[in-house]
Amino acid sequence: MNMKNIIKNKQKELMQGMIALILCMALFCSAAVSGENDGSGWKMRHDGQKYEKTGTDGQVQIPLYAGILAEFRTNEMKILADNQEILAKAAERAAEEAAHPEQGVYTFLQGPKSWTEGRAWSGEWSNQYVRGNYFGNFGCGLCCMANIYCTLTEYTCSPWDMYEYARQVSGYAPSRKIGAIGWADMKVTLRKSGFDCTLNTKPESYEEFQQEIAASQMAVVLVSSRDDDTYWKKTGGHYVSISLYDASSDRVFLGDPADPDGNRSWISLRYVYDALKTVSQYQYLLVQDYAEEQNQWMHDGITDAWGGM
């Protein structure tokens, strides 16, 4: 199942649960109390039959729970009526998210300029200083990894959280000269976070690349303008994340940590294929699946200051 279907299924389950809750409340209240009042008291229904009990004075006796259920029904119906607008807006929001699954995809930015400008998806991690290098200069791969973790699990983390975890569980050791995380350390870190992922080289045919991307949930790709500068300019090597492959338009949803203007845009998958950095040992990492029981990290929450979604 690809990531687009996962997001749609989550939204569908949410809506079904909301509708089921409303119907159950209404049906329970309707079944519990008949709503008839003959002037002398409430009549209860039992197995579809009216039930009433008369006292020695011939008056209909009101069972204790009849009043409780009647009051419960009145209160619940009032709650439903009072929240009708909220429920309607929630339904509209769910429908909007189903029509635009990219709203559930995380796309963090790495640079300090974006953070200074108050851009959405930017954060204070950009100014973290590591062994003579700022995160904003090398954090593209870690942003992509955080995108995957936040999008495909029920948890969240910041790119800096991902940096710290990669340092802990892999051989990742950034330096002044080389700060970017390598393919092997990326794969190890994601595997320990519960992801089934593979490292891949550029296939001979574009059609094969299309099939691989379509079958994956998300991907991290390494692009370079030296291979093709149709989309990326003056880029020696840069990690970006792609997801939600649309076969009808042959486009993917782009998470570009270094480009606040191009981030969260739909681009031709062909641009990605042509720009794959061929001098690298690998060109892209495919995320095939996520297994909660394999997640050794279970990190949840972003404590860094950031611009939000």
Where are these regions (language model features)?
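Gram-positive cell-envelope targeting signals
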Residues: M1-N37, R45
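Active-site-adjacent structural segments surrounding the nucleophilic cysteine of cysteine proteases
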Residues: G35-K177, M298-D300, W306-M309
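A short local loop/turn or secondary-structure capping micro-motif enriched for an aromatic residue
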Residues: I62, D229, D261-R264
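Noncatalytic regulatory segments and standalone regulatory/sensor domains
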Residues: Y106, K113, Y245-M309
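Stable alpha-helical elements in mature extracytoplasmic
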Residues: G136, G141-I148, S158, M162, ...
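Structured segments of extracytoplasmic/periplasmic soluble domains
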Residues: C143, N147-Y155, Y165-V169, T189-D196, ...
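Mid-length scaffold segments of soluble, non-membrane domains
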Residues: Q168-T201
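Active-site-adjacent substructure of cysteine-protease-like catalytic cores
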Residues: T201-D259, Q296
